[in-house]
Amino acid sequence: MDEKELKQILATKAPAYQRSLIEIPKDSFVTWHSSLTDYLDSVLGDSPKMQNRIDHLVMRYRLGATDEVKGEHYGTVLPRINRNGMIVGGNVIHFNVDDGSILNHDALVNHLYSWYAFDYYVDPNVFFGEHLLYGRLAVVVQEEKTALLGTLAYPDIEWLAVGVGNNLTDEMMKKLIGRQIVLYPDDFCVDFWSEHFGGKFKVDDSFTHCDINQYLIDFIHSRQVP
């Protein structure tokens, strides 16, 4: 073992306040199909056009898969990527392929000790989908799955997700000032989003008592989105 390898291993043992911030390499995550893409296939159909759109979604969001199987399906790697193209966090989620519910959820960084022998750079104030943010019109939702369905249903709107298990922060919303933004909270975060961000941004509570994911799926089918 050389000095560099020893330093990398020791870095994973250091207290959090002593760790250096090192970028997770872009080529460390290979896009692949998983329980989430299997779910999308099951609810949206397997027509060639839809399959191509889902494949394109996998590449744009750099969705990956773990080799850990639950319910006969691979876990989904949902990386958060900043505007510089750096992977700065994310989630690893196993989805129920039949209904899209979450079977198991874990933060991406919790897997890094077993995947890498070096420390990592994490920024909790980055949206899922932020690396694709270029226009002025954007929607903010809680779950990554919702943002992906929204992109398929309304491709002209940029969809951002806070991420399962994460909270919307002032730092995240500061980056959206000057854009046309609509926040669609679920029933768990509607009070906080409305009270904390309602003064500067539009908060629409239309989906606090109905399933936004099912709405998007129905919209795709009804409009026959290609």
Positions of predicted regions on the chain:
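Sequence-level detector for tyrosine residue identity
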Residues: 17, 39, 61, 74, ...
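TOPRIM fold recognition
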Residues: 135-136, 146-226
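Phosphate-handling DNA/RNA-contact segment within nucleic-acid enzymes
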Residues: 68-177
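Extended hydrophobic/Leu-rich segments
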Residues: 6-10, 50, 54-57, 102-112, ...
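Serine/threonine-rich low-complexity intrinsically disordered regions
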Residues: 2, 14, 20, 25, ...
